[in-house]
């Protein structure tokens, strides 16, 4: 709520407004130039977050739940014990839901790395940076680069390989990279491929970045990016498990510190559970909420088999345009079912919104089907409205719908979503 999906969506909505302003003239509106005021949206965004926090606090109070502010750490004892502010607490059930934290390079890896900020720091910016450099190729990097550039910050996205979102389906990875590069026509955005920041220095005019670019088959080159107002690391997230003294209870973790749990969110210590990003699986707020709810049903309502099914969890990337994806990628489906048992349906088109606009974005869609019955095991799309249209299609995938089920629906015309029920 504070530094995650809620304020991010507010900023994405703001960036979308900026994009639409560029299209107003094409739709017949004159004199639509408008100066963006960062302070106005920051104040409104922060007030919205504050209202939500008050609502959550009121709900906790009404439910007679005591909130203790502080940092918990586990202590030795005959039963699992947590200490907060010098006071010890124990209970038959202890849940660890501490989430994750942004990864920041060590100073011995990249001198001056601490001069940069993370996605948490993005929400503390008091002004729109004039010059921004985002390091990373995941969804957080893509989203923040899109927001800043759309709002007028000259932005560079630094990626180590040739594409962003490389864990997504190849269609999405390629198209999103292409859309980012094409965005330079409206926003001020460049994608620097095969590039890494090697050193950061503070100067009188901002930050100075020393960048190494190593294109395949070519000798690495070193360049300097001066006058950077905002260097943002979006290179991954670490589990927020340091300082918990998990070893005091013998709670098992992986090499990165993620807490190991079974399908019912149990750790290896009886009465201690973990959900959410601290477990390192499906790092999404709704996943943590759903897993916590299922755990509560099991522990307090006697539903012994209550657990979250982690298959076919839908997710959206608030890029420009947005991405929606659920299920297996094409490569994952081939690995699971075999190449001969996988059939792909795909399409690419220009959304009707752009029929009269100079600015263009594409909409791409892919349906991954498996076996003779052509069960739909994956849907991947990027385009205007894909963020909102995914939820319903995700229900169909979860229910085991086939390609024939999609074909038997009457299309809603004219929409982009109709393409998924008319694929050939």
Swiss-Prot record:
NADP(+) binds at residues 137, 140, 143, 160, 166, 236, 283, 316. FAD binds at residues 8, 72, 277, 285, 413. It is an enzyme of class 1 (oxidoreductase). Transmembrane segments: none annotated. The active site is at 413 (proton acceptor). Its cofactor is FAD. The keyword NADP applies. Glutathione binds at residues 56, 293. GO terms for biological process: cell redox homeostasis; cellular response to oxidative stress; glutathione metabolic process; response to activity; response to cadmium ion; response to ethanol; response to iron(III) ion; response to ischemia. Keywords: Cytoplasm, Disulfide bond, FAD, Flavoprotein, Mitochondrion, NADP, Oxidoreductase, Redox-active center. Its main location: mitochondrion. Belongs to the class-I pyridine nucleotide-disulfide oxidoreductase family. The active site is a redox-active disulfide bond. Homodimer; disulfide-linked. Catalyzes the reduction of glutathione disulfide (GSSG) to reduced glutathione (GSH). Constitutes the major mechanism to maintain a high GSH:GSSG ratio in the cytosol. This is Glutathione reductase. It comes from Rattus norvegicus (Rat). The gene is Gsr.
């Amino acid at each position: 709520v504070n530094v995650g999906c809620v304020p991010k969506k507010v900023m994405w909505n703001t960036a979308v407004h900026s994009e639409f302003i560029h299209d107003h003239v094409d739709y017949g509106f004159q004199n639509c130039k408008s100066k963006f005021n960062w302070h106005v949206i920051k104040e409104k965004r922060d007030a919205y977050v504050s209202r939500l926090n008050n609502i959550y606090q009121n709900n906790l109070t009404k439910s007679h739940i005591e909130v203790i502010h502080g940092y918990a750490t586990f202590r030795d004892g005959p039963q699992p014990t947590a200490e907060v502010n010098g006071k010890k607490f124990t209970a038959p059930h202890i849940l660890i839901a501490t989430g994750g934290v942004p990864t920041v390079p060590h100073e011995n890896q990249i001198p001056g790395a601490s001069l940069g900020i993370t996605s948490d720091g993005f929400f503390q910016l008091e002004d729109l940076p004039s010059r921004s450099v985002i390091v990373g190729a995941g969804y957080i990097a893509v989203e923040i680069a899109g927001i800043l550039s759309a709002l007028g910050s000259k932005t560079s996205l630094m990626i180590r390989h040739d594409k962003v979102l490389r864990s997504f389906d190849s269609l999405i990875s390629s198209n999103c990279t292409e859309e980012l590069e094409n965005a330079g026509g409206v926003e001020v955005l460049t994608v620097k491929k095969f590039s890494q920041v090697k050193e950061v220095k503070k100067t009188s005019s901002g930050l100075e970045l020393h960048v190494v670019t190593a294109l395949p088959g070519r000798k690495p080159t070193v360049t300097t990016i001066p006058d950077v107002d905002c260097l943002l690391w979006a290179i991954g997230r670490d589990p927020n498990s340091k300082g918990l003294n998990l070893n005091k209870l013998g709670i098992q973790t992986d090499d990165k510190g993620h807490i190991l749990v079974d399908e019912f969110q149990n750790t290896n210590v009886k009465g201690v559970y973990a959900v959410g990003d601290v477990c390192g699986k499906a790092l999404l707020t709704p996943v943590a909420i759903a897993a916590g709810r299922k755990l509560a049903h099991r522990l307090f309502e006697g539903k012994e088999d209550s657990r979250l099914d982690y298959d076919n969890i839908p997710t959206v990337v608030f890029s420009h345009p947005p991405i929606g994806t659920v299920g297996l990628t094409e490569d994952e489906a081939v690995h699971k079912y075999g190449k001969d048992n996988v059939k792909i349906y795909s399409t690419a088109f220009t959304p009707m919104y752009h029929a009269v606009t100079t600015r263009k974005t594409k909409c791409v869609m892919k349906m991954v089907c498996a076996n003779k019955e052509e069960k739909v095991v994956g849907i991947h799309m990027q385009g205007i409205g894909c963020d909102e249209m995914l939820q319903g299609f995700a229900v169909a995938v979860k229910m085991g719908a086939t390609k024939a089920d999609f074909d038997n629906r009457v299309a809603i015309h004219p929409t982009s979503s109709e393409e998924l029920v008319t694929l050939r």
